Swiss-Prot record:
<feature type="compositionally biased region" description="Low complexity">
    <location>
        <begin position="134"/>
        <end position="148"/>
    </location>
</feature>
<feature type="modified residue" description="Phosphoserine">
    <location>
        <position position="173"/>
    </location>
</feature>
<dbReference type="GO" id="GO:0016592">
    <property type="term" value="C:mediator complex"/>
</dbReference>
<feature type="region of interest" description="Disordered">
    <location>
        <begin position="128"/>
        <end position="211"/>
    </location>
</feature>
<comment type="subunit">
    <text>Associated with the Mediator complex.</text>
</comment>
<dbReference type="InterPro" id="IPR038823">
    <property type="entry name" value="MED2_plant"/>
</dbReference>
<keyword id="KW-0539">Nucleus</keyword>
<feature type="compositionally biased region" description="Low complexity">
    <location>
        <begin position="189"/>
        <end position="198"/>
    </location>
</feature>
<keyword id="KW-0597">Phosphoprotein</keyword>
<feature type="compositionally biased region" description="Basic residues">
    <location>
        <begin position="202"/>
        <end position="211"/>
    </location>
</feature>
<protein>
    <recommendedName>
        <fullName>Mediator-associated protein 2</fullName>
    </recommendedName>
</protein>
<dbReference type="GO" id="GO:0005730">
    <property type="term" value="C:nucleolus"/>
</dbReference>
Length: 211
């Protein structure tokens, strides 16, 4: 069966020099050294003074790398190894014929205690990052508050307008009915007045004839 294997993005190919299998023997001791990514120190010393039988801190050296921003020139490193953390793994050199050259006998950690100036610089950088983050968060909150207040004021004004229009507007049909009824009343009153005047004129005529 064919398997399609894809390397993840976190995988980094080491550019260090490969081991030469001609100089390796079964009696050589290999260490698995752990250090932060991009902060591996440079060791110019040909020999290291160590106490191989000691558990814990068993040696030290000075870093000669002046180009790294995270490390100080001449910084002191301690070599730490604990028997409970021994790797117990085989070291294999990749080649045409993969060959086992030895066992990883120690898991070594590089321990360095930073200088006070380094700690102050790190604290300043962290405080600046926090201040920038707080400023951006406050600006976002203020913009959100202004937008919400504008939305609320717009809804309130529209509601007030609708309520005001509801109070001011009166139905037109009752006015028309009232005007029509009032005009009818005026017409009836005028007709009664005219009728009464005609009757009075007739009565006057009758009186004259009788005389």
């Amino acid at each position: 069966m064919d398997f399609d294997f894809k390397v993840s993005g976190d995988f980094i190919v080491s550019g260090a020099e490969q081991l030469d299998d001609t100089d390796l023997t079964r009696s050589d001791e290999f260490w698995l050294i752990q250090a932060p990514l991009g902060q591996f120190p440079e060791i110019e010393e040909n020999t290291l003074k160590i106490e191989p039988d000691k558990d814990g801190l068993f040696g030290e050296f000075k870093d000669s790398n002046a180009g790294s921003l995270h490390l100080c020139l001449g910084a002191k490193y301690d070599l730490a190894s604990f028997h409970s953390q021994d790797a117990g793994a085989e070291l294999i050199i990749p080649s045409e014929e993969s060959m086992i050259v030895g066992k990883i006998t120690r898991r070594v950690a590089l321990v360095r205690y930073p200088e006070p100036n380094e700690l102050l610089q790190k604290m300043k950088a962290r405080t600046q990052q926090k201040l920038v983050g707080s400023v951006t968060n406050s600006s976002k909150k203020s913009s959100n508050l202004t937008q919400s207040s504008r939305h609320k004021s717009g809804t309130r004004s529209s509601r007030e307008k609708s309520m005001f229009s509801g109070f001011t507007e009166t139905p037109k049909s009752p006015k028309r009915k009232n005007s029509e009824s009032s005009s009818g009343k005026h017409r009836s009153s005028t007709s009664t007045v005219s009728g009464s005047s005609e009757r009075s004129a007739k009565s006057k005529k009758k009186v004259k004839k009788e005389e």
